[in-house]
A protein has these predicted regions:
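C-terminal substrate-recognition/cap domain of FAD-linked oxidoreductases
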Residues: 1-120, 124, 131, 135
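Short proline/glycine- and acidic-rich turn/helix-capping motifs at secondary-structure junctions
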Residues: 26-40, 140-155
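Gly/Ser/Thr-rich beta-alpha loop segments that engage phosphate groups in nucleotides
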Residues: 98-103, 139, 146-148, 183
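Short amphipathic alpha-helical segments
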Residues: 119, 123-127, 140, 148, ...
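Alpha-helix capping/hinge segments and adjacent helical runs
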Residues: 133-145, 170, 174-178
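Activity-critical C-terminal alpha-helical subdomain
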Residues: 149-185
Length: 185
């Protein structure tokens, strides 16, 4: 017969634990537990943000990146090193879907500066994306490319991936009628 989904999840988590990929896990048994876990996630980011506001770190560069799970720790060390060399007072908060490598990687800058990053926010973002690329990640994960990131597409995607995206877009929408005026290529 079929194995219930909870048993499948337990088996996967047990294997991850045995391989030292995780140290703990929780499976929600009902909607109240699920809501409780979500509130912890949301409260943690909000709490950290309030602490940063006390130091006037209120400008935020938000990034939606993905990485191979096994690279997250090394990526974060490299990113923190780059960020502290860039502007030592910057701080990061990252959270998200660690199990599949999708991260909301937010960098907070000084609220006294026009953009919070000494006018270097795009340069900082490019440096971060270079580190993402080093670890075979993507500068855009679950939220897609969109208008804000379209200029990063050719720079931060390898040529094969970029070409495949163009081919797929042209095959699915040869007349350019889906999302007109927003074509990325």
């Amino acid at each position: 017969g079929q194995i219930p989904i909870i048993k499948t999840i337990e088996n996967v988590l047990e294997e991850c634990f045995e391989r030292n990929l995780i140290s703990d896990a929780t499976i929600c048994k009902n909607e109240n537990q699920s809501k409780s876990l979500w509130s912890i996630r949301e409260a943690a980011a909000e709490s950290e943000k309030k602490e940063l506001e006390k130091s006037n770190l209120i400008k935020c560069l938000k990034h939606d990146i993905s990485l191979p799970v096994e690279s997250i720790d090394d990526f974060h060390k490299d990113a923190q090193n780059m960020i502290s060399n860039f502007l030592p007072e910057l701080r990061t908060i990252y959270f998200g879907h660690l199990g599949d490598g999708n991260l909301h990687y937010n960098i907070f800058g000084n609220g006294s500066l026009p953009d919070g990053f000494k006018g270097e926010s795009q340069n900082l973002t490019n440096k971060l994306y270079e580190i993402v690329h080093k670890y075979n990640g993507s500068f855009s994960a679950e939220h897609g490319i969109g208008q804000l990131k379209k200029n990063n597409l050719k720079t931060h995607k390898n040529n094969v991936a970029y070409s495949l995206m163009k081919i797929i877009k042209n095959q699915l929408d040869p007349k350019g009628i889906m999302n007109p005026g927003k074509v990325l290529f």
